[in-house]
Amino acid sequence: PLEVAIVCSANPEDYTARGKIVTPLKDRIGSEIRTHYPEDIEEGIAITAQEAWAQRDASNIEIPHYIRQIIEQIAFAAREDKKVDKRSGVSQRLPISTMELVISNAERRALLHDERFVVPRVGDIYAALPGITGKIELEYEGEMRGADTVIREIIRASVATIYDQYFADTNTQQIEQWFNLGGTVQLNDAQPASGSLAELQQIQGLIEKLGPLKINSESNPEITVSAAEFLLEGMYAHKRISRAEERVFTAAEKKQRNTDAANYAEKMREREIERDDYAKNRTRRGFN
């Protein structure tokens, strides 16, 4: 006689109604093993590190720990978000596939610029947006907002959460002031890490604030740029500065509106003075 063992895997409730084990078959299963989501970020990081395809051929990959934390935090935040369908859930496959996409985008950038080190950035997480939306089912409210909008908000909130673990006590006023004075910087894949680093070094006090991430003068450009972008993304997440979709960092929108309003008010005052002077001159000519 043959000894046959059957192992079945199914979600308790699947939105497609195809994943449930039929009752006659379930009655013949000896044991039911109930699993659960990772209980904390570090447990999720360990699972993702074990399962994700991270070892690439001919690539010197270095994944900063804060990138791992943000990716896991996205899953944790999505599980608590009211706009995400709790019945379908958010499985550990989300951070696993996201990590693979993040590494792939970083690897593409390194190959494009012939760089030795592959170091993922926060921008690579946003580049993985299509993969994240494919792993999440939304409630009605989320559908009305749009999947991309909901996921961007979750990523932004996740960056803010992890940012606070490193920079909660960091004074960023000097950096904010640089942007308030009209400074802008763009970080994208179009230029190598050395070029991005040269632009970032122009921001007063930025590189010096990266101490919590163990960045120093000997750190390679790829790692330094990734850390600096994380700090800027955290400031953007807390609305201390602004960022456009083209990844151009500028002054906070409120500061920009205040500046525009002040400039407008100044122009109006100048026009009033010109009108008063014109009226006075016209009056004088009338009496001559």
Residue ranges of model-derived segments:
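Canonical AAA+ ATPase core
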Residues: 1-59, 104-112
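Amphipathic alpha-helical transducer elements in NTP-driven molecular machines
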Residues: 3, 15-26, 38-45, 61-72, ...
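Generic preference for well-ordered secondary structure
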Residues: 5, 9-13, 86, 116, ...
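Signal for well-folded cores of large energy- and translation-related assemblies
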Residues: 20-21, 26, 30, 34, ...
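Short, surface-exposed, charged/polar-biased interaction segments
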Residues: 27-30, 42, 46, 50, ...
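Conserved AAA+ ATPase small/helical "lid" subdomain
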Residues: 44-119
